[in-house]
Amino acid sequence: MGFGGISLWQLLIVLAIIVLLFGTKKLRGIGGDLGGAVKGFKKAMSDEKNTDKEKPEQIQKSEESAPLDSAHTEKNKDNNKV
């Protein structure tokens, strides 16, 4: 018994038929495309983790700049009174 009731010989026969149908060059190209897609996915996931680490720093910077924004709005209120 192999994988889910499929024996090793059956897997080899299916693999041989696939190679005969598509050829080795086409299978190599498909494998390269699949590998590139996996590599891109892993890179995107690592970039996502890096942006998650940067978010607390950005929040802290925005809290520090908040008093500047409130001072600016007070000037606008004074200008509106005139």
From Swiss-Prot:
<feature type="transmembrane region" description="Helical">
    <location>
        <begin position="2"/>
        <end position="22"/>
    </location>
</feature>
<dbReference type="InterPro" id="IPR006312">
    <property type="entry name" value="TatA/E"/>
</dbReference>
<comment type="similarity">
    <text>Belongs to the TatA/E family.</text>
</comment>
<keyword id="KW-0653">Protein transport</keyword>
<dbReference type="GO" id="GO:0033281">
    <property type="term" value="C:TAT protein transport complex"/>
</dbReference>
<comment type="subunit">
    <text>The Tat system comprises two distinct complexes: a TatABC complex, containing multiple copies of TatA, TatB and TatC subunits, and a separate TatA complex, containing only TatA subunits. Substrates initially bind to the TatABC complex, which probably triggers association of the separate TatA complex to form the active translocon.</text>
</comment>
<dbReference type="InterPro" id="IPR003369">
    <property type="entry name" value="TatA/B/E"/>
</dbReference>
<protein>
    <recommendedName>
        <fullName>Sec-independent protein translocase protein TatA</fullName>
    </recommendedName>
</protein>
<keyword id="KW-1003">Cell membrane</keyword>
<dbReference type="GO" id="GO:0008320">
    <property type="term" value="F:protein transmembrane transporter activity"/>
</dbReference>
<keyword id="KW-1133">Transmembrane helix</keyword>
<feature type="region of interest" description="Disordered">
    <location>
        <begin position="43"/>
        <end position="82"/>
    </location>
</feature>
<keyword id="KW-0813">Transport</keyword>
<dbReference type="Pfam" id="PF02416">
    <property type="entry name" value="TatA_B_E"/>
</dbReference>
<keyword id="KW-0811">Translocation</keyword>
<feature type="compositionally biased region" description="Basic and acidic residues">
    <location>
        <begin position="44"/>
        <end position="64"/>
    </location>
</feature>
<keyword id="KW-0812">Transmembrane</keyword>
<dbReference type="GO" id="GO:0043953">
    <property type="term" value="P:protein transport by the Tat complex"/>
</dbReference>
<comment type="function">
    <text>Part of the twin-arginine translocation (Tat) system that transports large folded proteins containing a characteristic twin-arginine motif in their signal peptide across membranes. TatA could form the protein-conducting channel of the Tat system.</text>
</comment>
<feature type="compositionally biased region" description="Basic and acidic residues">
    <location>
        <begin position="71"/>
        <end position="82"/>
    </location>
</feature>
<keyword id="KW-0472">Membrane</keyword>
<keyword id="KW-0997">Cell inner membrane</keyword>
